């Protein structure tokens, strides 16, 4: 991108933590980046505040009942921003000339449709929505390839692999990729010690500032399991070439090992603004607001194997990847229901993997040929997990 061109960015999920980081980077470069579309699920007041600050051309609220509040709020603020509501409006804007880049940061399966719409329209897609790849990875990558869309991952691990692979013309010489995990707030605890974990403890991540659902996924290691499935789709690697290491300092974000024995790693402070700056400006580099890494001050880098006995969600993700078809969609849907129940205090922490495993073993995988097949599997998995919530033995 030349210095004189202006990249118009749609930030889907603008009121979340990733959206805030994206808007921080965009605001630092008004000469080359503009937030042209902002969306939120139901936080209409927060969306209005962002519109006042960033003055996008369009604002979308997913909850159609809040459309009058958004429309009137924009008018009262004296903004020319056009108000929209509902998923269809989001999809239409993703595919329109209102943007050339989409930050896909809507949490959960709700973000899939707009992500696919952006890919089908050939946009640069900064992908933070893990579920799009886990639920429909083959469909998304195929759609993007056909339309010439560019998928740039912005979670730290896949961004690290992206940067390592793009640093040289050696993608065919990859022996394996190694995703790093912080281990979450409960690293080192035995399984029995996890029974009394509370939602407040689970969302208190030691390194990253994230939303509640992703924080719980990090605590269970499901986040890393989903990233294994993502890496399979993003980089075209079989599961056997994707490993996981626990790295509590969260400074080495991932590594790529080549067949000649060389290993490249990407390091940096744990701040999403770095990876967002990579995606927004690639192949150029721009200031992100994140400081450099002082290895002398950090002192040490530690690595250890993940404990899949205490944290079985990582193993369940490997199982789903090996099974293929709709199994990853089933895994993801069951996990969303289980995590929601945990955050509401309905079940304990250990019930999350128990519920996911129950649904994975109960439902038969199908070939993931169409989006309808995947969405049906998603809905069926949610129903199965909801029914299992009433089963006392799963509430460990």
UniProtKB/Swiss-Prot annotation:
> Does the keyword section mention NADP?
yes
Q: Where does 1-deoxy-D-xylulose 5-phosphate bind?
A: 130, 156-157, 182, 205, 218, 223-224, 227
Q: Where does Mn(2+) bind?
A: 155, 157, 227
Pathway assignment: Isoprenoid biosynthesis; isopentenyl diphosphate biosynthesis via DXP pathway; isopentenyl diphosphate from 1-deoxy-D-xylulose 5-phosphate: step 1/6
Q: Which reaction does it catalyse?
A: 2-C-methyl-D-erythritol 4-phosphate + NADP(+) = 1-deoxy-D-xylulose 5-phosphate + NADPH + H(+)
Matching entries from Gene3D superfamilies are given as:
1.10.1740.10, NAD(P)-binding Rossmann-like Domain
Task: Indicate which residues the UniProt annotation says bind NADPH.
Answer: 15-18, 41, 129, 131, 211
Q: Which cofactor does it need?
A: Mg(2+); Mn(2+)
GO process terms (BP): isopentenyl diphosphate biosynthetic process, methylerythritol 4-phosphate pathway involved in terpenoid biosynthetic process
UniProt superkingdom: Bacteria
Q: Name one GO molecular function term.
A: NADPH binding
User: What family does the entry list?
Assistant: Belongs to the DXR family.
Q: What's its job?
A: Catalyzes the NADPH-dependent rearrangement and reduction of 1-deoxy-D-xylulose-5-phosphate (DXP) to 2-C-methyl-D-erythritol 4-phosphate (MEP).
Q: Which NCBIfam families match?
A: Dxr (TIGR00243), PRK12464.1 (NF009114)
Protein name per its UniProtKB record: 1-deoxy-D-xylulose 5-phosphate reductoisomerase
Organism expressing this protein natively:
Xanthomonas campestris pv. campestris (strain B100)
